[in-house]
Amino acid sequence: MDSKIMNVLVDRVLELGPKVEDSGPYRNFKLTQDGDGIAWLLFDRAGASANTLSADVLEEFDLVVAALENQRPAGVVIRSAKPSGFIAGADVNEFRGATDARVVETSIGRAHAVIDRLEALRIPTVAVIHGFCLGGGLEVALACQSRIAISGARFGFPEVLLGLHPGLGGAARFTRLVNPMQAMTLMLTGKTIDARKAKSLGLVDAVTEERHVRNAVRDAVFGRLKRARPGILTSILNFAPVRGLLASRMRSEAAKTAPRENYPAPYALIDLWEKHCGDKAAMLAA
């Protein structure tokens, strides 16, 4: 068979690491380890065609991260076992009809803590992303040290379209990783970008095909993959005096289509960036 045809067929099959013989102790995740000592964490939400971050999923995710803290594998790769994509975001159905702001804040705080715990792992963490990586899914990816995109992947923070903004630390991580004007524009508009654009921005470290995933993962875990680093322009644009000027311009642009009294979320995001971006810990806590 022609090699090009073979490559097309191979790239339709997700590379999910070692075969998992049983479901293990988790309902929504599968955890195994390959011959290189790399843990493969597969996100496969039970009874759903797409992965979303619900309260029960995040509770179990926290248990998985705790297990990784104890096992200390050579590294961990996080993948979706769903053909539809990586993670489609938070399960917003859990917040419909909520009347007590304190309950919502508590739920968000718990989710935030899980993502922070993932970021704090003292082993290489690699997100391998296919399909849609949106909202909370991008929050998970940003908490990893490396991000590898499969051609065709799409990235974005659509929360603003729901009257929200990234609430699990993604705003802090995103604006410190890539040009904050680009990052803020994406968050303020809710637009998505493809894998190539994500690579050019520095959001992902590599774009590859399924047949090359294992090699890309090894390169990331063992330090052979060149990781995207924030450039000098990113540092300059995040500098407080410059930030103030840019934030003022962002508010003016937002006001043209989204008055503050009707659409507070974009302005809350701009305020968050302007006030706290110089201190990541403060921005994460805000």
Predicted regions: what they are:
Residues 119-234:
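Crotonase-fold acyl-CoA enzyme core
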Residues 45-49, 94-95, 275-276:
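A short, flexible beta-alpha/helix-coil linker loop
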Residues 2-42, 139, 186-286:
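Amphipathic alpha-helical segments at domain termini/boundaries
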Residues 116, 174-175, 255-260:
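Short amphipathic alpha-helical boundary/capping segments
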Residues 89, 105-108, 112, 135, ...:
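Glycine-rich phosphate-binding loop at the start of an alpha helix
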Residues 36-42, 58-102, 113-130, 150-154:
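A structural preference for short, pocket-lining loop segments at secondary-structure junctions
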